[in-house]
Amino acid sequence: MGFEKYYEAFPAYTDVYSEEYRKRIEALEPLLMKHMPAGGRVLDLACGTGGFSFLLEDLGFNVVALDNSDVMLSKAREFAKDRGSKVEFVKGDARKLPFEENSFDYVVFIDSLVHFEPMDLNSTFKEVARVLKPSGRFILQFTDLRALLPVLMNGQIVGTEYWISRVLPDTDEKTVVLEFQSEKEHFRVRFNVWGKTAVELLAKLYFRQLHSERMNEHSYFQVYAPKK
């Protein structure tokens, strides 16, 4: 029940030239420009195929992008070659970042919380605080999956071929299994369930919140400063 099949079924989520990716970039670009004055070194954490890494590079940043998936990094490097990009793509563990202390002006963490269990996210936030400069900023964007669950239970259509046929939360709703159905097949994926309150409580162990705003009904954009 990993994400490999999920990204295979929904290729628009990993194709930086797709309409879906373009919409995500258009929604976030004004916020990134507002809260990230141009210039400096940025870590794009859990970068996937690099769509936001390339955006940040276009905005004038020196970008290092990290992911633990060989498949995602291979695609990212193909896109980078096609674009003539100088983004440095690194394979690594977000829980133990391969970078020195105080080495980044910004760390961005975009729409990746579903991949992280509570202990993993705690370690990741701690590492982000370590690698950020004292004057640095942590940019966090996430979907409140806990609030979204009732919507998903109504058989939400996903993409052009699939719909969610079953929603199976565990007893304490820390994870949920979503069953995706099409005319040809079905498959299941397990997501970690993060709500806004839980994210903020964990982040405040290591950061001071400077800004928070709702992007849409279930999505949030937040800015934090390290407690240094």
Predicted regions and their residues:
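Conserved class I S-adenosyl-L-methionine
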Residues: 1-37, 55
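Class I SAM-dependent methyltransferase "Motif I" SAM/SAH-binding loop
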Residues: 46-50
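Class I SAM-dependent methyltransferase SAM/SAH-binding core
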Residues: 51-95
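A short acidic, Gly/Pro-enriched loop at the edge of an enzyme's catalytic core
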Residues: 95, 99-106
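A short SAM/SAH-binding and catalytic strip from SAM-dependent methyltransferases
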Residues: 106-120
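A short glycine-rich, Lys/Arg-flanked "PGG" loop and its adjoining helix->strand segment in the class I
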Residues: 122-134
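SAM-dependent methyltransferase
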Residues: 139-198
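Core SAM-dependent methyltransferase catalytic element
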Residues: 206-208, 213-228
